[in-house]
Amino acid sequence: MARELIMVMRVADYIMQRLVQAGVAHVFQVTGRGTLFLSDALAKIEDLQAVSLHHEQSCSFAAVAYAEKQRGLGACLVSTGCASTNTITGVLTAWQDGVSCIFISGQNILRETTRHTGIALRTYGQQEADIVSLVTPITKYAHMLQRAQDIVEVMD
């Protein structure tokens, strides 16, 4: 049923609905080009409140503090490249302290990422960074979504 449902809705909407199902009530965010659809989906869900901050590191620390205080899941939404790398200290804090958080980073169009060009470049797309490689050692799970139909499995 979920796989059928995902074909008629945006991935961004599905992600936000899953956050609500996981008990998330607040998402700490800095909007950007890479999160356009995610920010739109967040704004449309009545059960989620967007908390906009001025820096990605603030968002990551806010998500960690919120999760600790609420004894639940903290959520952070940031854009691509430098925006995602700005969250790494908060990600590490969550990892070291065993705090449950989800850090969602926007991404460029797949054909504009170093993973898909086949060219040995440090960056290819606008504000791109291979955030998955950077955070894999300090997370339980890090993934770059490459096919919309994989979102159900990724969010599980």
PLM-predicted stretches and their roles:
Residues A2-D156:
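N-terminal alpha/beta PP-like core and its mobile active-site loop of ThDP/TPP-dependent enzymes
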